[in-house]
Structure formats: structure tokens, C-alpha cells
Amino acid sequence: MIKWLCLFFSYILMVSSHSWLGLWLSMEMNSLSFIPIMIEESKENSLKYFLIQSVASVIFLASILNQSFSFLIPFALLIKIGAAPFHMWLVSISKSMSWKVLSLLMTFQKIGPLLGLAMLQFTNSFFIFISAFIGGLGGINQSNLRLIMAFSSVSHLSWLMVNMSSFFLMLVYYVTYLAILYFAVILLQQSGMYSLAQMNSNASLIYKASISFNLLSLAGLPPFLGFFIKWMSLEMNILSPLLVLALVVSSCFSVYFYFSIAMSSLLFPSEVKSKKMEIPGILSMGFNIFLPLFFL
């Protein structure tokens, strides 16, 4: 219970930090609170996470204390957040995590680094480009749903970086991504699904449709909510044509892959009929279909 309280308090400190040193202290508190939660599931994953976060923290602290190394601040934050090309640690530990811990890692654990990048208004085209393509291509031919979500997280980081020039746009994108992801995670956790093979046999039609809608929304397929926040990002930011093309193409890769998953799962006959599983499924479908009306 104490570790969860410390974790929650660290998020409050991150949001209320007004200096680099304050942000560093809150991120350290956050990491030290999150590691005990990871240890309960895997000591190996917690060790990997500790080492990566420690290296990034040392770089970050050295950068803010010595102006000669200030150019390293965004690199330290990108390592912490798992953006490409520093994403391999995130992929490595994601494949054996529970849905609860993985969802925290892909959402709330990114608050500190995202705030730091927003303070810098970091919109480097190279990192946006490489995160978009690795995130889009990485999920292809993966059968582990946790790995698919991890690569999806890398892809969405590219869109978050696109919106770094406006804190409001970044916040809207982040909150929307968080909501879509958590709907998907709730459904997957209830059924105990961890692989694509399980999607073909262990759920009712409504359940499979709802998880498919969430995946397609994460990929950015119209008319789901995920499409509208990506469209908003392109409309509200001044981007080079090449970068826009890269973002659109990477989203197309994701849509193609997720659409094939959705079709293969929905075409299989349903055997399980559980109202407990159908209620959140119906809610998530309504969320993804009707909320986009506010963007019109």
C-alpha cells in the first residue's frame, strides 16, 4: 500500500514541478516507487528497468548541473520514456508483464519525461520519424499482445512529440490515448488474454468486437476516436510534407496489421457468453464510436 501511495504522490510532484531539479527528484521518487511493484512480478524486469532509469537519471542530472551538457537533457528523457531508438528495453520487459503493470508503464510512468520534453518543446523530426516507423512496423507478425501494445506505445510517442509545441494539444492527445488504452487493457485483463491465438476462441462476439475496435482506434482508423486525435495533430501543427507522409504511412502499417487481427478474430465462432465481459466491451465501443462526434 505504501508503494502505491508513494507512486501516486510522485505523479503529483511531477505535475507541480517548476524546475529541472524538482522534475528530476520527482522522477527518481517515481522510479523507486514503481520498482517494488515490478519486483512482485519479475526480478529480472525490475533490474532492467532500474539500470535503464539509473543511467538516464545520471545523464539528466549531469545535464542540468553542467550547462556544457545541457544538449543531453532530451536524450535522457527519451531513454526514460522508451522512444525509438532507445525503445528496446521497453519491448524487452513488456512481453512478460501483467496488464496492470504494463498499462502503468505505458501511460502514467511517462508523465515526468513528457513534461520535461514539453518544457523543451521538443519536436525533433528525426526522433518523430524513427519512432513512427519502428512503432508501426514493429507490431507486424507479433503474436504477443503485450509486445503489440509496446510497439503501439512507441508509435504514439511520435505523435506526442509532434504536439510538443502546444501543451494543450499534447495533453488532449495523451488523455485520449490513455483512455483508449485502458479500455483495451481492462478487456484483456478480464479475459486473461496475452496472445492473438486466444482472441480467436476465448471470447464472445461483443467482446472480440470491442477489443478490435480499441486496437483499430489506437492504430488511427476512421471513424474511431484515435483517428480524430491524429487528424487534429496534423491540422494544428506546421509539419514538413515528408514528416506528415512518414506519420501517415506508419499509421497505415498499424491499421493494416490491426485490421487483419480484427477480421481473423471476428470470423471465428464465439463460444463464451459472459455479461460481465460484455458490459465494458459495450462501453468501450460507445466511447470509440460516439465521442468522435465532438470533433466534428
UniProtKB/Swiss-Prot annotation:
Swiss-Prot/TrEMBL GO biological process terms: mitochondrial electron transport, NADH to ubiquinone
GO cellular component term of the entry, any: mitochondrial inner membrane
Superkingdom: Eukaryota
Oxidoreductase in keyword set: no
Keywords from the named record: Electron transport, Membrane, Mitochondrion, Mitochondrion inner membrane, NAD, Respiratory chain, Translocase, Transmembrane, Transmembrane helix, Transport, Ubiquinone
GO MF annotation list: NADH dehydrogenase (ubiquinone) activity
Lipid bilayer topology: Multi-pass membrane protein
Enzymatic class: translocase
Principal subcellular localization: mitochondrion
EC number: 7.1.1.2
Catalytic function, reaction form: a ubiquinone + NADH + 5 H(+)(in) = a ubiquinol + NAD(+) + 4 H(+)(out)
Localization, UniProt: Mitochondrion inner membrane
Transmembrane segments: 5-25, 49-69, 71-91, 114-134, 167-187, 209-229, 242-262, 276-296
Family classification: Belongs to the complex I subunit 2 family.
Role description: Core subunit of the mitochondrial membrane respiratory chain NADH dehydrogenase (Complex I) that is believed to belong to the minimal assembly required for catalysis. Complex I functions in the transfer of electrons from NADH to the respiratory chain. The immediate electron acceptor for the enzyme is believed to be ubiquinone.
Name the UniProt record assigns to this protein: NADH-ubiquinone oxidoreductase chain 2
Organism from which the protein derives: Artemia franciscana
